[in-house]
Regions:
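Conserved beta-strand positions in repeat-built beta-propeller and related beta-rich domains
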Residues: 59, 67-71, 115-119, 166-171, ...
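Short loop/turn segments immediately following beta-strands, especially the blade-tip
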Residues: 78-85, 124-132, 258-262
Length: 305
């Protein structure tokens, strides 16, 4: 998620996320999910409740809230016309993208709403401000982007300082292959016109959203780590379930830097070797190159934003 205004946007977007949640949950007073609260001095209300299974949010410079809905292959545009905190106007901004192609990533940048799915990276405009895109341009084509078969197909996209950053995760849980075997598990960069493809970082399993740390040029993201850390041990003792895998490895909050290697699938968390690759001849060398996470989170928590 991109936060252009470091003073207010983090709170605005965080509250908006809660406001548009529309999954079937226990609802408390005024439609707020039970257990959801905000700090003293803040107030939480429902801004829009009709969008089902929203994914990511983005604001433009006129206050329009865009909501990606991957299972519908569409983006909705929400407008608060009277300033009361609720969105009276809901339109379909773009539609017709295959649900299996996972339209999710969005960013408003230099007058255009950029978005991405498995087929490409696009930029769009609503020149007459009616809530519907009247111009959509494919900037980066499918032939330039990582292949998208298998799992972890959520394309991340970030634009900063006129550079496009994009990532698609590992096609399996932990694919053992040479680093440059394919374009996945990496962050790639492009110029704003789609030219100049360049490698930025490697060893990334599945970072579904890339962010700029407010007030800096730093690129951050949460990487969702593997699901079978203890497989070789636990499969021999099925009656014990998954005592290792249920709690390991941690999800990683990473600061992504140019040329950085982030360990996947061989090195996990704070330089812990993947138990499934203990016989790999380059394990120690890869550990020496691994960029240590800035922070670790509980296993399988799948954090974003």
């Amino acid at each position: 998620m991109h936060f252009p205004n470091t003073k207010t946007s983090c709170w605005t977007k965080a509250l908006a996320v809660l406001a548009v949640v529309s999954s079937p949950v226990m609802m408390g007073q005024e439609g707020i999910p039970d257990g959801v609260w905000v700090r003293p001095g803040f107030e939480l209300s429902v801004a829009e409740s009709s969008i089902k299974k929203p994914r990511f949010l983005e604001f433009d410079d006129r206050g329009t809230l865009y909501v990606s809905v991957p299972n519908k292959g569409m983006i909705n545009a929400c407008r608060d016309n009277d300033g009361d905190g609720a969105y009276e106007s809901l339109t379909t901004y773009v539609e017709g993208y295959e649900s299996g192609k996972i339209l999710q990533a969005m960013q408003f940048y230099k007058g255009w709403l950029w978005f991405a799915d498995m087929t490409g990276i696009y930029k769009s405009q609503d020149s007459n401000h009616d809530g519907n895109a009247d111009e959509v341009i494919k900037v980066v084509g499918e032939d330039q982007l990582p292949i998208t078969g298998g799992g972890h197909k959520w394309r991340a996209m970030l634009i900063h300082n006129d550079v496009i950053y994009t990532h698609v995760g590992d096609q399996t849980n932990a694919t053992d292959e040479p680093i440059m075997e394919n374009d996945r598990k990496k962050i790639w960069t492009f110029n704003l016109d789609g030219s100049g493809k360049a490698l930025f970082a490697t060893g990334i399993r599945n970072t579904e959203e890339l962010c700029i740390r407010p007030g800096t040029d730093e690129i951050w993201g949460v990487d969702h780590d593997i699901d079978t850390l203890g497989l070789k041990l636990e499969s021999k003792h099925p009656k014990f379930g998954q005592p290792i895998t249920d709690h390991n490895p941690p999800a990683e909050l990473n600061h992504y830097v140019k040329g950085g290697f982030y360990g996947h699938p061989y090195i996990l968390g704070k330089n812990m070797p993947n138990l499934n690759f203990l016989d790999h001849p380059d394990l120690i060398e890869m550990a020496s190159k691994n960029v240590i996470p800035e922070w670790v989170m509980p296993a399988h928590c799948s954090g974003n934003g």
